[in-house]
C-alpha cells in the first residue's frame, strides 16, 4: 500500500477570479494511484522502448506518449479531472484553453462523460489539432494571438456562461493524472537513473517528478523547455514566477508565457534542473526519432530527446528515460522540420555559384558534384541580379549529400575548378 504523502501549497491567484483567491492545493501519491485506477481502459500504458542509437554514451529509453490515445499525454490529466467533477459542475458544461493537446484530451473526456465542452485555442494552433478537437466533440473558439490570449478569452467565456474551467496544468487533479506516467516509468524500468520531461506550463513534470521522487528520491528528474519559450527556466533561475513578453518556437505545445503557480512550486521542490534547447536542436531530435526509432514527434514532444542528444545534462553512462510527450505535428510543419534537420546534419544544402553565362557551365558544375558523390535536386539560374555583370549569372543549386564533410569536398572541388562560391544558403 502506497504511503500517503500530503503537500500543501497556499497560492495567491491573480487572474483566475472564478477560483478562490487562496487555494489549498493537495497533491498526494494516493491521488495519483487513484488516477491510474480511473484511467484504466481510457489511457494506454504506453511502451518504454530502448533507443541506443540516439546517444551512444547514454542508455536512452523513450516513454512513447506520442502513441497515447489523442496523440499526447494530456488525456490523462483532462480525463481524471473531469471524472472528479460534481454533477452540478458537469451540468454547467466545460470550458478550457489549449494550444492543441489539452484541447483534445478535454474534448474526448467531456464527450465520454456526456458533457458539452468549449475549447479556446490560439488561431496559430496546428490545423490538425484544431480539427481533431472538433472531431472529438468540442466546440472550438479560435482566438487571435498566443495560448495566453486564448486563456484570457476562456476566462471571459467562463464569466459569461458559468461553465466549469479545466486548467491545462495548474490543477492538482490534472497534475495527478499526468503523474501516472511516473508510476509507469518506475514499473517499466525500476533501475532508471534519470527522467527527462518537456515543460510548458509545468503540469506534466510536476506530476511525474512528484510520483518518482515520492517512490524513489534517488532518481533525477530534469525538465526541458524551448529556448524561445523559457518561462519555467527563467522562473527557476530567479526563484520566482516570471512572465515572458513573447514566445517564439515551433514547439507550440510548450509555448507558454507564464508557468502555473502550483507547478512552479512543485518544480522548485522536485525537479533537479531545467535546461533549454534551440529550434535546430528540436528539429534534429524529431528527425532522429523518425529515422532511428520510426516515431513521429511534435516539437514539444522531442525536447527531452534533444536535451539528451546535445549533451545538455550530466547523464553520460546513465539509464535515462526521455518522455516523448506528443506526436500531433502538422504535416506542413513536419516537412519544414525534416528539411531543417537534413540541413543541420549536412544531408541537404544549397550553394550559390557565380558563373559566366555561356554553354557548358552547368554541365561542368554537375559533373564535379557527381564525381564527389553529391546529388543535384534543384537548379535555378538568376540572370537578373544587379550585382552581376551582363555576361554572368548566379547558379542556385540544391544538393543531397551524406554529411558536412562531403559538402566541404564538393565546395573545394568547385573552387579548385575555378568556380566562385558566393554563399551557402539554407
Give the ranges of each region predicted by the language model.
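Intrinsic-disorder-associated, low-complexity terminal segments enriched in Asp/Asn/His/Tyr and depleted
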Residues: 4-7, 15-17, 21
Amino acid at each position: 500500500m502506497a504511503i500517503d504523502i500530503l503537500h500543501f501549497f497556499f497560492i495567491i491567484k491573480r487572474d483566475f477570479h472564478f477560483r478562490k483567491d487562496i487555494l489549498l492545493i493537495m497533491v498526494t501519491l494516493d491521488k495519483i494511484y487513484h488516477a491510474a485506477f480511473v484511467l484504466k481502459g481510457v489511457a494506454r500504458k504506453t511502451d518504454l522502448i530502448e533507443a541506443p542509437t540516439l546517444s551512444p554514451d547514454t542508455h536512452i529509453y523513450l516513454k512513447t506518449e506520442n502513441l497515447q490515445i489523442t496523440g499526447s499525454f494530456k488525456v490523462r490529466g483532462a480525463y481524471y479531472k473531469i471524472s472528479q467533477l460534481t454533477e452540478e459542475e458537469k451540468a454547467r458544461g466545460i470550458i478550457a484553453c489549449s494550444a492543441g493537446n489539452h484541447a483534445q484530451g478535454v474534448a474526448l473526456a467531456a464527450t465520454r462523460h456526456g458533457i458539452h465542452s468549449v475549447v479556446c485555442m490560439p488561431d496559430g494552433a496546428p490545423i490538425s489539432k484544431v480539427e481533431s478537437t472538433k472531431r472529438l466533440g468540442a466546440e472550438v473558439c479560435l482566438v487571435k494571438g498566443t495560448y495566453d490570449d486564448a486563456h484570457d478569452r476562456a476566462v471571459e467565456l467562463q464569466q459569461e456562461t458559468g461553465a466549469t474551467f479545466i486548467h491545462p496544468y495548474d490543477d492538482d487533479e490534472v497534475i495527478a493524472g499526468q503523474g501516472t506516467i511516473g508510476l509507469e516509468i518506475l514499473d517499466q524500468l525500476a533501475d532508471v537513473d534519470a527522467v527527462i520531461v518537456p515543460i510548458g506550463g509545468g503540469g506534466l513534470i510536476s506530476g511525474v517528478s512528484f510520483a518518482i521522487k515520492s517512490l524513489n528520491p534517488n532518481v533525477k528528474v530534469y525538465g526541458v523547455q524551448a529556448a524561445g519559450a523559457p518561462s519555467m527556466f527563467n522562473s527557476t533561475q530567479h526563484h520566482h514566477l516570471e512572465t515572458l513578453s513573447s514566445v517564439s518556437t515551433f514547439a507550440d505545445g510548450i509555448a507558454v508565457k507564464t508557468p502555473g503557480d502550483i507547478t512552479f512550486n512543485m518544480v522548485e521542490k522536485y525537479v533537479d534542473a531545467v535546461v533549454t534547447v534551440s529550434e535546430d536542436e528540436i528539429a534534429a531530435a524529431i528527425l532522429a526519432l523518425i529515422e532511428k526509432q520510426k516515431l513521429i514527434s511534435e516539437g514539444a514532444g522531442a525536447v527531452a530527446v534533444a536535451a539528451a542528444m546535445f549533451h545538455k545534462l550530466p547523464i553520460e553512462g546513465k539509464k535515462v528515460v526521455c518522455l516523448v510527450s506528443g506526436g500531433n505535428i502538422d504535416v506542413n510543419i513536419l516537412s519544414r522540420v525534416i528539411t531543417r534537420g537534413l540541413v543541420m546534419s549536412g544531408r541537404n544544402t544549397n550553394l550559390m555559384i557565380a558563373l559566366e553565362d555561356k554553354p557548358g557551365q552547368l554541365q561542368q558544375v554537375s559533373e564535379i558534384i557527381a564525381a564527389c558523390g553529391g546529388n543535384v535536386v534543384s537548379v535555378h539560374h538568376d540572370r537578373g541580379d544587379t550585382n552581376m555583370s551582363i555576361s554572368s549569372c548566379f547558379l542556385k543549386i540544391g544538393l543531397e549529400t551524406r554529411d558536412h564533410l562531403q559538402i566541404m569536398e564538393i565546395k573545394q572541388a568547385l573552387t579548385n575548378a575555378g568556380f566562385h562560391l558566393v554563399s551557402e544558403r539554407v
